Regions:
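Bacterial Sec-dependent N-terminal signal peptides
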Residues: 1-28
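Phosphate-group recognition and catalysis centered on beta-loop-alpha active-site segments
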Residues: 21-265
Length: 265
């Protein structure tokens, strides 16, 4: 089936079922909580640390988001920033980066250190952002290394991938067909996501506010919707009412309490 026909059929499907779905937005969806960069806004924790993953697990987060970079010597390092304390993730050696401390006194962890901690837990999922590289030719190796390590530690079935770059997303979908991949950049419609093989969208709060209809459209296509980064009660209420599947937040306990309150528990 060529792309034009496939797109036409998807749009026909949406036009048929969207009116009914629009009437039930937010109903029946059990929104799940994802701790942004782990649960770090709590005593003794830090962003993208082993502790933040374990603390996310300790409060029952559905998922703990983590950022990973590929270093100059081809080691995967957990950190958000492209440059951290003067060290550029892509051009420095892993030994230099791993010797740098986080705000809670821990050293910057390798990806394997996070996976080792994850293996000791049984519930919380890893929401893994593979970071864009300046050298896109490294994407096949970077994704392949991620896939091998997830299998090595036995946590592939508890991991979901999130990416910004289109080339990186395509490589993840190609190399990890059994793993759900979500798009972060906000520039693809639900129909385009479906066509490219994504499991759903993981879009910034402002993008989803400007395109509320995408939530129902995504659900109609069997896709899921995650939104980031939602930290106030008012905005949490907004996206719960919209019926998103996941909310990524720096305030996971606040969101958990709100969900319990709304369910009457």
């Amino acid at each position: 089936m060529n792309g034009t026909i496939r797109t036409f059929l998807l749009m026909l499907l949406l036009s048929t079922i969207m009116p009914a779905i629009g009437q039930t937005a937010g109903k029946g969806v059990q929104t799940k909580v994802i701790s942004h960069r782990g649960y770090w806004k709590t005593e003794g924790s830090a962003q993208n640390s082993v502790t933040s993953f374990l603390k996310a697990d300790s409060i029952g987060s559905y998922g703990s988001e983590l950022d990973v970079w590929l270093t100059a010597d081809s080691v995967l390092i957990a950190n958000h920033d492209r440059v951290f304390k003067g060290l550029a993730m892509e051009t420095f050696l892993s030994g230099d980066i791993l010797a740098t401390r986080l705000s809670n006194g821990e050293y910057v962890p390798s990806f394997e250190a996070i996976l080792g901690a994850m293996r000791k837990t049984s519930a919380t999922r890893l929401i893994l952002e593979i970071k864009n590289l300046k050298d896109k030719s490294k994407y096949p190796y970077e994704v392949g290394l991620v896939a091998r390590l997830l299998e090595k530690y036995g946590v592939a079935d508890r991991t979901e991938i999130i990416v910004f770059a289109h080339e990186l997303g395509a490589e993840c979908i190609r190399q990890m067909p059994g793993t759900r991949v979500f798009h972060l950049n906000g520039d693809l419609t639900p129909t385009e996501l479906k066509e490219r093989g994504y499991a759903g969208m993981d879009y910034r709060n402002t993008i989803l506010k400007a395109n509320e209809h995408w939530v129902a459209e995504a659900h109609a296509l069997g896709l899921e919707v995650n939104v980031w980064t939602v930290n106030t009660r008012e905005e949490m209420e907004y996206f719960l009412n919209l019926g998103v599947d996941y909310i990524t937040t720096d305030e996971p306990e606040l969101l958990q309490a709100l969900i319990r309150e709304r369910s009457g528990k």
